[in-house]
């Protein structure tokens, strides 16, 4: 018998704004300064999802895709709350915001409200020329995106001790003489790694210099003599 069927349902709304701009701030015979900007802003949300209804909040949702009114691929996680100084176990928040070492993954996960795709991205830079000398730059940026850091998560995996290279941050792990720390115990018998959470959910915003170049253009008269 058929218990489920795939269907193309739901609506993804995208509200975009794109900008491309180049402006000459200075322009004369000897000097030219041009600023350029390229950018995109995207606001998306889901609607008309005929899926599961959260028994607590009543929200319509598809775990892994999103919920009505939220961004696509929104994270749905148990919230990580640090380390229990008494025993080194991981601490979490239940749905009501109470601390617990043993969250229920069926009832204590909450929607993050964060985007896993950029809200804004683009580049900007300037071109400066003065009597043949020039400087050119470009910066790239991404804003409004949070994603799980799988690489760092793997480097902090205590089950890989003595098998693979791991992060030096594990040296800060909880011990009876190091109780105030942000790294849980690595001792067996703890709850570390037992629960999926947003512990390694990381803001991925960045501003990076893509390139910078400096040079000199030989005058045409000089080139004609070569």
Can you name each region flagged by the protein language model?
Residues 4, 30-32, 44-50, 90, ...:
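Outer-membrane beta-barrel proteins
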Residues 23-25, 39-45, 130-132, 139-145, ...:
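Transmembrane beta-strands of outer-membrane beta-barrel pores
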Residues 7-13, 17, 24-116:
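Conserved small-residue
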Residues 33-35, 124, 130-137:
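Transmembrane beta-strands of outer-membrane beta-barrel proteins
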Residues 142-226:
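Extracytoplasmic gating/loop element in the C-terminal half of outer-membrane beta-barrel translocons
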Residues 2-5, 20-22, 103-112, 162-164, ...:
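Extracytoplasmic loops and strand-loop junctions of Gram-negative outer membrane beta-barrel proteins
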């Amino acid at each position: 018998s058929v218990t489920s069927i795939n269907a193309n349902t739901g609506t993804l709304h995208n509200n975009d704004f794109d900008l491309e701009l180049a402006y000459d701030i200075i322009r004369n015979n000897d000097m030219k300064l041009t600023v350029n900007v390229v950018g995109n802003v995207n606001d998306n949300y889901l609607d008309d999802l005929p899926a599961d209804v959260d028994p607590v909040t009543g929200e319509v949702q598809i775990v892994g895709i999103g919920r009505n009114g939220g961004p696509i691929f929104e994270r749905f996680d148990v919230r990580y709350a640090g380390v229990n100084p008494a025993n080194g176990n991981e601490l979490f928040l239940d749905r009501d915001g109470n601390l617990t070492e043993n969250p229920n993954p069926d009832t204590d996960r909450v929607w993050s409200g964060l985007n896993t795709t950029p809200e804004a991205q683009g580049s900007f830079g300037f071109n400066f020329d003065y009597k043949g000398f020039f400087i050119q730059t470009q910066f790239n940026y991404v804003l409004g995106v949070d994603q799980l850091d799988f690489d760092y998560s793997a480097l902090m995996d205590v089950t890989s001790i003595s098998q693979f290279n791991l992060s030096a941050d594990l040296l800060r792990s909880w011990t009876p003489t190091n109780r105030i720390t942000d790294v849980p115990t690595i001792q067996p018998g703890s709850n570390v790694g037992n629960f999926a959470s947003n512990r390694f959910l990381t803001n991925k915003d960045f501003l990076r210099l893509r390139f910078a170049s400096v040079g000199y253009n030989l005058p045409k008269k000089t080139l004609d003599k070569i």
